[in-house]
Amino acid sequence: MKSSEIRQAFLNYFVQRGHQIVASSSLVPSNDPTLLFTNAGMVQFKDLFLGLETRSYQRAATAQRCVRAGGKHNDLENVGYTARHHTFFEMLGNFSFGDYFKREAIQYAWEFLTEVLHIPAERLWVTVYKEDLEAEDIWLKEMKVSPERFSRCGEKDNFWSMGDTGPCGPCTEIFYDHGPEVAGGPPGSPDEDGDRYIEIWNLVFMQFNRDREGHLHLLPKPSVDTGMGLERLAAVIQGVHSNYEIDSFQYLIKAIAQLGQNIDLNHTSLKVIADHIRSCSFLIVDGVLPSNEGRGYVLRRIIRRAVRHGNKLGLPSPFFFKLVQPLIDVMGDAYPELINSKAHIERILQQEENQFTRTLEQGLRLLQDHIKNLKGQELSGEVAFKLYDTYGFPIDLTADIIREQGLHIDMEAFNQLMQQQREQSQAASQFTTDYHAVSQLDHQSEFHGYEKESMEAKIIGLLQEGNEVKSINKGAKGAVILDHTPFYAESGGQVGDKGLLIGKNCSFQVDDTQKVGQAVVHYGEVIKGELTLDLSIHAQVDHIRRDAIRLNHTATHLLHAALKKIVGQHVQQRGSLVDAERARFDFSHFEALNPQQIQQIEEVVNAQIRANNEVITQVMDIESAKQSGAVALFGEKYSDAVRVLSMGDFSKELCGGTHARRTGDIGLFKIVAEYGIASGIRRIEMVTGRYALAWVNEQLGFMNNLAATLKTTPNSLQEKISQLLLDNKNQEKMIAKLLSEKAQKSGADILGEIEEIKGINLLIKQLEGMDSQTMRHTMDQLKSRIDSAVIILFTIEQNKMNVIAGVSKNIIGKTPSAAQLVRHLCGKGGGRDDMAQGGGNVPEDLNSKIKEIREMIEKI
């Protein structure tokens, strides 16, 4: 039974038992900033378990893509060296949110393993939490599990919690017995660390809530969270002991071996690379790009580890990107996003490998030199840090190499150097706090801005300097909270609205609108009278500004769709700022857009504007929205009910912002800038509507002025400038020829001033009225005509000197270098051993310094 068939059998089994199949969530968690990567099936349901979210279903099943590399859950250093450690794995899981509990969960697990997959019951071992008598009775009395294959374990192994407080509960685990020929004892025994008994399924029963004092309270609706590693299960079904022997891994391993010559299929490096192509490809699919921090740095570490192992196997570089197609062969049916992103993944992997290969050989040589000279078993932290800082070696890559040779690293010294570097970096950065910061508010505002730009409302909260007050007087800055408001609070990249709050004998100018908890907070200044609590006011949004923002926001959606069409489906929005005068859009991409791409994008967006499609908004549940093809933004957290914005069949995105009624309202779209802001992140700045027209007119005005200056017409500008550049190039050639002739004459004139000292031809000469370029030409002429020469030429003007020195290559090492001669004469300068240049104030003892140079030559 193939891995793909096992995955599908699991999902089919639970569909037949009323479970909703939920697609694997991104490897980048959207609901947990403390988590580097999704590392378990329950991550996407965390808010459900915490009671912060509800869904339309109470039973779910998933095949979740997981990564454990970096952070608390880091398997990287063991990958390839053990039978079951991976950076990437699939976790099969079934979940109950207040529906079924222990009995059904246990029955489902046992039935699937023994009746669907036909695993002999006598090869399975079960553990429960020692105080969970209910689960024990279900296993022993109802499932008829033999007491000889059953054990009770303590809290460390069989009690799960989400944190120090919150939902928690006992768990029961199912192990597979690989047989007495494999070392190791049963779970809970002193020999349990062996490989004979391998955990394949963990069933967590969340039935308690732990308070701050550590007391457990029964939850009103207990839940079930289960997880089973597909790779481990496949090893059991396929009768192999190591996960790397299952069908999907073997396909990859053979594909890697084919890239080299005479490679042993059991080589550890093949396992490392096979694992790493999985994690790297799926991380890139989910929007992670190699960088020097956070998730991007973990990806970079994994790629570089794979490249190093490829180097160890003698694979011709670049090789890693060639494994994307074999990965698609085994996983593309289950995860079509791999197929859609194939070219993007290959491009990123090839680019990253090429970049690292340039320093890999140098770093390896440096490391091997230090290993040869080691007097003990420890590599210094300084060497490890140099490999990291100069050659791009992640510390775990260095540790890998060191471990293979039975050595270790002085990690304390390495960590101290890393800390020093972090402190220096932090000292160079200054941050300011947001003046809008306020304490958490209990107030709640109802937003009506989708359908209204003005309305009557009542003041339910007033703030000054972050504190609640009862009134705000004329001239004072503060913030106002209304029970109902048409003002849009900054969110999703769209800036907050501005406008006026007008009451009887008072008014408040709104300069910004933000969301704090459930309250919409209007920041600004009282420009008339006094504002007090419970005052009735008229809220009026600046509709001209709002309309301009609408156009820009709708245009960002068209831009996003156009980028995917022109640049590639790998493009993901990474941020935006939608203001009235202009907007910016950040997106994932690995290189600058070329002029042709920018022009194509503008043409596509403006074509959609001319189509004048209606901008349609629908409210639906998140799963229906995703199934309809709506684009969900990278890393964004969504509630169960979402707004889906559609423009014909060209763009469909989840969005809570305000938008134009039709695409034609935008009028005109222009890209005014495109540049990189971080590794793998590009930014487009754009204008629309009347601001786009103003920008175009500004550019036309500039062209007209330039044409007038050059005495031509705007249509002939390109031809005129090309001719000017050609004329300039010809003049530069003529100047270069004249300089060369002048240098030849100058060189010929001073050849007679050469002194021969011990076989070395020395020339030190002050030149009058000669510029630097001519002086360099003269030096080249002299060096080409004089053998074994030390030549120093200098000019003096307004007490400043310019010096150039040259040393024939056949005497380098016998005489002072050219750079040393320049510094000796004028104190400043640098260059190569055979040619250097410098300058500065004329030294008072210039003649003495010239004499000292002669003495240096005489002493050779």
UniProtKB/Swiss-Prot annotation:
It comes from the Bacteria. It is found in: Cytoplasm. It catalyses: tRNA(Ala) + L-alanine + ATP = L-alanyl-tRNA(Ala) + AMP + diphosphate. Keywords: Aminoacyl-tRNA synthetase, ATP-binding, Cytoplasm, Ligase, Metal-binding, Nucleotide-binding, Protein biosynthesis, RNA-binding, tRNA-binding, Zinc. Its main location: cytoplasm. Its cofactor is Zn(2+). It is an enzyme of class 6 (ligase). SUPFAM superfamilies: Class II aaRS and biotin synthetases, Putative anticodon-binding domain of alanyl-tRNA synthetase (AlaRS), ThrRS/AlaRS common domain, Translation proteins. The keyword Aminoacyl-tRNA synthetase applies. GO terms for molecular function: alanine-tRNA ligase activity; aminoacyl-tRNA deacylase activity; ATP binding; tRNA binding; zinc ion binding. The keyword tRNA-binding applies. CDD domains: AlaRS_core. Belongs to the class-II aminoacyl-tRNA synthetase family. This is Alanine--tRNA ligase. It comes from Legionella pneumophila (strain Paris). The lineage of its organism: Bacteria, Pseudomonadati, Pseudomonadota, Gammaproteobacteria, Legionellales.
